[in-house]
Amino acid sequence: MHTLHLIFEPRPKAPRLHALIVADAFQLPANPSRLLQTTKLECLAASMQRILSHYQPRVRTNHSVLSSRAVAQHLGSDNADPPRPETILYAQNHDPFGRKSSFLPRCADNGLCHADANPVSEVPESPPSTVKSSGDASVSDKDDDGLMDRCMLHDGAKGLLAVPRSKVQTSSGQVAETSPPQLSRKVIQNATSSSLYIKVERSKPSSRKRPSCIALETDEKASGPRIRARLGAKVQPSLGQVVEKFKRQATQHDTGSSMCIKPESARSKPIRRKRPAGAALETDEKASGPQTRARARAEASEASEASSPLPIARSARPYSAAEDDILQTLVARGLAWEEIEKEFGLRFAKRTMRSLQMRWSRKLKLTAPSTRCSKRKRSSASL
């Protein structure tokens, strides 16, 4: 148990109240959860107007009555109990005359306490002096950070929770960095001329992006924070279902792509000309060498002529002189074109009747002697 010996000085202006935190700026206790539990003071703010009208408290930060490290160790011990609102006192003054001034807080609906001070007596002025604490820390009465306040955390346990303004931000950031993410807290200070507020909030956990395949669980709201093991148990079956679904889609895509022809592949390939049916079926391979295009075309036309009942014009094949002479003699004999075709086919390669007629009408008809003239000569000779 530590006793506070406070020094009060008259001050004409309203003092500046600084935020108080229960933590050391450079070292945390062994159990940070105990520290955060004790710092969770929902009713730790009070109005100091009525007290300041009677006396002006001024406690130098270099008068370290009880160091913050000793306070942190005391609060982190197993014997420390969480504070109760009815035992929080903002002024416990042990002066040489044995007079005390105290007040009790009353809590509002918003969780902050505004205390009505009932001072018993005014405290006389006392000269500044140096006070030593149990932590063997003694300092002079020079302070650049201004006025610090003190507060009673337990029944009978007095402590000065005074941290300079320059160390308040460092210590609060250090608490948030060194503590685990589940137990991190933000100590927010709002200091005014008449009241002191210390607001402890629980920092929001870092939101991790859930995979898109996991459905939003809207029906489970009031069950509290989700445990990692519970979340893992829910994620594993959903991932397995996603893998199976992906495999099914892949197989469907493969089968669908094999049945259809992509336009890109069709455009990339050059346009091929259709080959004749007879030339495509090359079953008879002769020993005369590779077939040329003309030979393949001739064989294809011969096959088509043989299969079709109607006469089809042959490809241009010139008539020889012997063929022209035989054709002239057959025509001169006065045979029908069917007989001429048969006799001509017996001697030479087969020619169609139309081909023979065209050859006769274009070439041989002009050069052959007319039959009319010969008939007249014969008739005149007979006379």
UniProtKB/Swiss-Prot annotation:
Myb-like domain-containing protein; part of the subtelomeric hrmA-associated cluster (HAC) containing genes that alter the hyphal surface (such as reduced total chitin or increased beta-glucan exposure) and perturb inter-hyphal interactions within the developing biofilms, resulting in a loss of vertically aligned polarized growing filaments. Consequently, this hypoxia-typic morphotype (called H-MORPH) with altered biofilm architecture leads to increased hypoxia fitness, increased host inflammation, rapid disease progression, and mortality in a murine model of invasive aspergillosis. It comes from the Eukaryota. Residues 318-364 form the Myb-like domain. This is Subtelomeric hrmA-associated cluster protein AFUA_5G14865. Induction: Expression is regulated by the hypoxia responsive morphology factor A (hrmA). Residues 119-134 have a biased composition (Low complexity). Keywords: Cell adhesion, Virulence. Residues 118-145, 249-318 are annotated as: Disordered. GO terms for biological process: cell adhesion. The lineage of its organism: Eukaryota, Fungi, Dikarya, Ascomycota, Pezizomycotina.
